[in-house]
């Protein structure tokens, strides 16, 4: 009886060992990579950056290294890579959102909603240009980014630039109108006021007090 029990126990140990080894063999390969959260980056590009090849044993996928390699792309703000057993790897990407850009001698610098200059590249269509003498001042730049980020999608396409001043900001529209924004505060209400004035006649508007909009 003891010999039989010992034999059963040994068999269980062997089976457990085989089961533990399976993920590291070609029996359980990666059959697909699922990429989510990417907009600017092409899915194929993310797959290439991960370095994960279809057919790689699931247990041999180095998810930490894959995440580090994807994070090396300037568009990537953060990334998570995890195994989705039995045969897939999930790559969840959070990209920088280019809300604004600055034209410099070396090219167009994209600025995200945190004020980070993260890439020199062609700006997206919905990014707003930042101009003016104070654009190099970090505090003024943060204020300008906050203004640009608050502009609604419906208004954004009509805004050509935000002029960065020391304490005040002005918006220029694509058709040459001016909107005085004032200080970078109460931006949510000013953005709502902006939606209204863009539908009005006039060449110059002031939304620095969003509850008392003026025009001329």
Residue positions per predicted region:
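Extracytoplasmic/secreted envelope proteins and their assembly/folding machinery
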Residues: 43, 47, 63, 67, ...
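N-terminal positively charged amphipathic segments used for targeting/anchoring
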Residues: 1-25, 166-216
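Second-shell loop/turn segments in exported
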Residues: 52-57, 129-137, 178-184
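Structured segments of extracytoplasmic/periplasmic soluble domains
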Residues: 49-53, 69-73, 147-154, 197-200
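Periplasmic polypeptide-binding modules associated with outer-membrane biogenesis and secretion
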Residues: 4-41, 48, 57-107
């Amino acid at each position: 009886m003891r010999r039989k029990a010992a034999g059963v126990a040994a068999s269980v140990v062997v089976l457990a060992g085989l089961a533990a080894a399976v993920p590291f063999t070609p029996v359980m390969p990666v059959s697909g990579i699922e990429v989510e959260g990417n907009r600017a980056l092409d899915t194929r590009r993310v797959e290439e950056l991960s370095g994960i090849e279809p057919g790689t044993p699931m247990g041999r996928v180095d998810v930490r290294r894959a995440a580090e390699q994807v994070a090396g792309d300037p568009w990537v703000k953060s990334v998570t890579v995890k195994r989705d057993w039995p045969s897939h790897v999930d790559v969840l990407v959070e990209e920088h959102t280019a809300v604004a850009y600055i034209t410099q001698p070396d090219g167009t610098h994209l600025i995200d909603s945190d004020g980070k200059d993260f890439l020199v590249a062609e700006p997206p269509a919905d990014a707003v240009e930042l101009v003016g003498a104070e654009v190099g001042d970090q505090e003024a730049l943060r204020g300008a980014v906050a203004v640009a980020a608050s502009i609604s999608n419906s208004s954004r396409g009509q805004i050509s630039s935000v002029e960065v001043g020391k304490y005040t900001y002005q918006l220029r529209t694509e058709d040459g109108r001016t909107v005085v924004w004032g200080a970078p505060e109460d931006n949510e209400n000013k953005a709502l006021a902006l939606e209204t004035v863009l539908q009005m006649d006039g060449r110059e508007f002031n939304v620095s007090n969003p509850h008392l909009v003026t025009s001329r």
